[in-house]
UniProtKB/Swiss-Prot annotation:
Quaternary organization: Homodimer. Interacts with MalT and MelA.
UniProt KW Cytoplasm keyword: yes
Protein name according to UniProt: Acetyl esterase
Active site, per annotation: 165, 262, 292
Length: 322
């Protein structure tokens, strides 16, 4: 697609999204476009500090949990003494960026709105870790907390997975991994997915959308994929191209959130249509005027806060139905 044939996205986004795009952090250096991944990670963490200010205070604990790849950092958020369930959160960042600090506010708000314990898992980033290491680390962390639930004062009888962008793929992939390999870590009551990628190689939205404003050009997406996967065959794995998995049975209830001007929107639409066609419990919600990654901006945008509340409500409703 020639760039001039793409939609003029920055002219079409909502007023509140434009406010975020135009927000300048005066002490922030330019994005290191030609820098190393380490430099980009450092910048991303610095840039996200502004957006994590003002999150709800609650009891928080940090722990390292064992996996076959070594110890993985986790952060547990306890919003209240009563804990109806535990949500595992997987951060986005194209598999190569992000950590527990860059998504701290998101996790705190999700814990506050759901009133469930939230555990963030700091899975090893790519390219240091190649598929399926991140999924195996997530599953190992779930198993560990299931076995040690009493020690950590958490309820692991009912669990959920949640994530944004690449983290959304990891969330659903982990839930399917548990199902397929018959691993008991508690009943998966729901999966919360914000603007994820689920395996499409091409789509209408990937052609019409994506640019320097969201880091999701076709070249960007190819770079993330090459960093994450071990080899070409992994592209068809049912835990990377989730449409190659069996989505006709025993898929946990899914809340699927899409952003109107996200190149990955068609991934979310296809996931919803597939699940709905096979009577798998799911809900799709489109957030008008939004760019990819809008969930970060709840400090300034009501729509971002609404999207977190919507996911929390979906999960709470599923708990009530059990």
């Amino acid at each position: 697609m020639k760039p001039e044939n793409k939609l003029p996205v920055l002219d079409l986004i909502s007023a509140e999204m434009k406010t975020v795009v135009n927000t300048l952090q005066p002490d922030l250096p330019p994005w290191p476009a030609t820098g190393t991944i380490a430099e980009q990670r450092q910048y991303y963490t610095l840039e996200r500090r502004f957006w994590n200010v003002g999150a709800p205070e609650m009891a928080t604990r940090a722990y390292r949990v064992p996996t076959k790849y070594g110890q993985v950092k986790t952060r547990i958020f306890y919003p209240q003494p009563d804990r109806p369930a535990t949500l595992f959160y997987l951060h986005g960042g194209g598999f190569i960026l992000g950590n527990l600090d860059t998504h701290d506010r998101i996790m705190r708000l999700l814990a506050s709105y759901s009133q469930c314990t939230v555990i963030g898992i700091d899975y090893t980033l790519s390219p240091e870790a190649r598929f399926p290491q991140a999924i195996e680390e997530i599953v190992a962390a779930c198993c560990y907390f299931h076995q040690q639930a009493e020690d950590y004062q958490i309820n692991m009888s009912r669990i959920g997975f949640a994530g944004d962008s690449a983290g959304a793929m990891l969330a659903l992939a982990s839930a399917l991994w548990l199902r397929d390999k018959q691993i008991d870590c508690g009943k998966v009551a729901g999966v919360l997915l914000w603007y994820g990628l689920y395996g499409l190689r091409d789509s209408v939205t990937r052609r019409l959308l994506g640019g320097v404003w969201d880091g999701l050009t076709q070249q960007d997406l190819q770079m993330y994929e090459e960093a994450y996967l071990s080899n070409d065959a992994d592209r068809e794995s049912p835990y990377y191209c989730l449409f190659n998995n069996d989505l006709t049975r025993e898929v946990p209830p899914c809340f699927i959130a899409g952003a109107e001007f996200d190149p990955l929107l068609d991934d979310s639409r296809l996931l919803y249509q597939t699940l709905a066609a096979h009577q798998q419990p799911c809900e799709f919600k489109l957030y008008s005027g939004m760019l990819h990654a809008f969930l970060h901006y709840s400090r300034m945008m009501k729509t971002a806060d609404d999207a977190l509340r919507d996911g929390a409500r979906f999960f709470s409703d599923r708990l009530q139905q059990d």
